[in-house]
């Protein structure tokens, strides 16, 4: 009897493997951090071989910890950091360059050049749902082809392959037999036409990217191929679900209905609203993306991305050394009644939605002689909630929907002070599920549905359960005063870097 699904969760700072049973309980988790490479100011890279070795290592480790063999595994689902770009040699399987990470800003100049062509810029937004930005994969691929010796010649001969991290992992798991992605990951490349559901020839021509490099685009839930976890002669396990991390979280939160909203507090913050079959073009700095692709049909989503969410807590711990453990931030923040007039704007890599300012930089405002470390810690936590409020306001305006309830997940969602402040500053109910590993759970759902482990979305939704509900409890005048202070602080940091 195949009792389990394994979700591979390949994130920005670590690779994880999580085993779920049929009742959606977590049997075991393994995690391994890997190296962050910063070769130049604003550049961020990963070693693709280390992404693979760390991910495969935790897969083997989690099975050993749980004492299960491949005979017990119904399927594997994959979820991944999105936009991160890997180009490798089709014949040798060797990457031609490090993975260029979604946070990397090296292609800002390429983007500025493209933006000068207003018609092209509008075309990109209209057809990919995205705005021209260094965040997405397209200009990263172009950079590799233009800057790695011999890469363009090889690409034009059909010898190089491109993939986001999901594609790379499937390629490696199937020993180079399968080169695929899913609708959600394709929609983050800035090369995929989300209306026609195909790679966009006009954008490929403009960026001089050969079509032969690109993977085949599949549903988010289907059997893509098989991997043999037991070596030669072992049982082949289907790889059966795949979606970008934020779309997996939306699915894992059972946001199946139009108008449902989730916010993930990871390295960044990512607010997504399921818009069903409607492509809503944002006028407020959000992007339109594919929420999920099932049985050849897609649902769309509005998305707002904050570059630095939970990462501000790591900064408080690692750089400022104000705490030794990220979990201690709540304890210290509670030692003061309010932020003491202090605001932290964590624009370390620029500002994401709704501002999209690559040249903004971080700052602390409102310091007085009475400000202490607890005020700064509290202000850093509050910054996560303020940035999420920015996204919620933009989403309300774009969608015309009143948002009364947000499902939350990710590491920082375990911080009760932050979640209560999130409810207070937005005036919305904040709901945290029992399982906050919703990204991995979404990947497990997708894989499980493909192989009949779970029969339907309805069966999945019945088992989803709530741990905590935070209701707004802040005076309206105070809410306005606090948020106005945030908006003043954000104005000050914009355009800082020349």
Swiss-Prot record:
Pathway the protein acts in: Polyol metabolism; glycerol degradation via glycerol kinase pathway; sn-glycerol 3-phosphate from glycerol: step 1/1
Pfam families in UniProt: FGGY_C, FGGY_N
GO cellular component: cytosol
Family annotation (InterPro entries): ATPase_NBD, Carb_kinase_FGGY, Carb_kinase_FGGY_CS, FGGY_C, FGGY_N, Glycerol_kin
Keyword Oxidoreductase: no
Binding site for sn-glycerol 3-phosphate: 12, 82-83, 135, 245
Binding-site residues, ATP: 12-14, 267, 310, 314, 411
Its EC number(s): 2.7.1.30
Domain of life where this protein originates: Bacteria
Activity control mechanisms: Activated by phosphorylation and inhibited by fructose 1,6-bisphosphate (FBP).
One Gene Ontology term from the biological process aspect of the record: glycerol metabolic process
Keywords: ATP-binding, Glycerol metabolism, Kinase, Nucleotide-binding, Transferase
GO function terms (MF aspect): ATP binding; glycerol kinase activity
UniProt subunit comment: Homotetramer and homodimer (in equilibrium).
Entry similarity comment: Belongs to the FGGY kinase family.
Protein name according to UniProt: Glycerol kinase
Annotated organism of origin: Clostridium acetobutylicum (strain ATCC 824 / DSM 792 / JCM 1419 / IAM 19013 / LMG 5710 / NBRC 13948 / NRRL B-527 / VKM B-1787 / 2291 / W)
């Amino acid at each position: 009897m195949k009792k389990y699904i394994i979700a591979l969760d390949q994130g920005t700072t670590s690779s994880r493997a999580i085993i779920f049973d049929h009742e959606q309980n977590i049997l075991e988790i393994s995690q391994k951090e890997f190296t962050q490479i910063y070769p130049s100011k604003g550049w961020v890279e990963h070693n693709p071989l280390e992404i693979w070795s760390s991910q495969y290592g935790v897969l083997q480790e989690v099975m050993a910890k749980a004492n299960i063999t491949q005979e017990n595994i119904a399927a594997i689902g994959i979820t991944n950091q999105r936009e991160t770009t890997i180009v490798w040699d089709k014949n040798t399987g060797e990457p031609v360059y490090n993975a260029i990470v979604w946070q990397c800003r090296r292609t800002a100049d390429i983007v500025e050049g493209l933006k000068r062509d207003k018609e092209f810029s509008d075309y990109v937004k209209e057809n990919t749902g995205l705005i021209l930005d260094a965040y997405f994969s397209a200009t990263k691929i172009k950079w590799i082809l233009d800057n790695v010796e011999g890469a363009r010649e090889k690409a034009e001969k059909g010898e190089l392959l491109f993939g986001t991290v999901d594609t790379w992992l499937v390629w490696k798991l199937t020993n180079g037999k399968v080169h695929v992605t899913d609708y959600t990951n394709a929609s983050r490349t800035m090369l995929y036409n989300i209306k026609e559901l195909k790679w966009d020839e006009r954008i490929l021509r403009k960026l001089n990217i050969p079509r032969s490099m690109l993977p085949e685009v599949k549903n988010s839930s289907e059997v893509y191929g098989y991997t043999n976890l037991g070596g030669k002669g072992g049982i082949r396990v289907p790889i059966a679900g795949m979606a970008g991390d934020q779309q997996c979280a939306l699915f894992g939160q059972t946001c199946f209905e139009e108008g449902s909203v989730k916010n993930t507090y990871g390295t960044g913050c990512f607010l997504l609203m399921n818009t069903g079959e409607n492509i809503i073009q944002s006028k407020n700095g959000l992007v339109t993306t594919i929420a999920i692709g099932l049985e050849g049909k897609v649902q769309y989503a509005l998305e707002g991305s904050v570059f630095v969410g939970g990462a501000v807590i790591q900064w408080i711990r690692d750089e400022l050394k104000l705490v030794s453990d990220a979990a201690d931030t709540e304890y210290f923040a509670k030692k003061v009644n309010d932020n003491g007039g202090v605001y932290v704007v964590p624009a370390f890599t620029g500002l994401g939605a709704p501002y999209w300012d690559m040249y903004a930089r971080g700052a602390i405002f409102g310091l007085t002689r009475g400000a202490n470390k607890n005020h700064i810690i509290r202000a850093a936590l509050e910054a996560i909630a303020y940035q999420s409020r920015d996204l919620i306001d933009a989403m309300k305006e774009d969608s015309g929907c009143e948002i009364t309830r947000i499902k939350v997940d990710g590491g920082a969602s375990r911080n009760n002070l932050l979640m209560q402040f999130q409810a207070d500053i937005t005036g919305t109910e904040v709901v945290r599920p029992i399982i906050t590993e919703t990204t991995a759970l979404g990947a497990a759902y997708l894989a499980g549905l493909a192989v009949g482990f779970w029969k339907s979305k309805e069966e999945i939704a019945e088992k989803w359960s709530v741990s905590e509900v935070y209701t707004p409890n802040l005076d309206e005048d105070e809410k306005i005063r606090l948020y106005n202070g945030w908006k003043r602080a954000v104005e000050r940091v914009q355009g800082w870097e020349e």
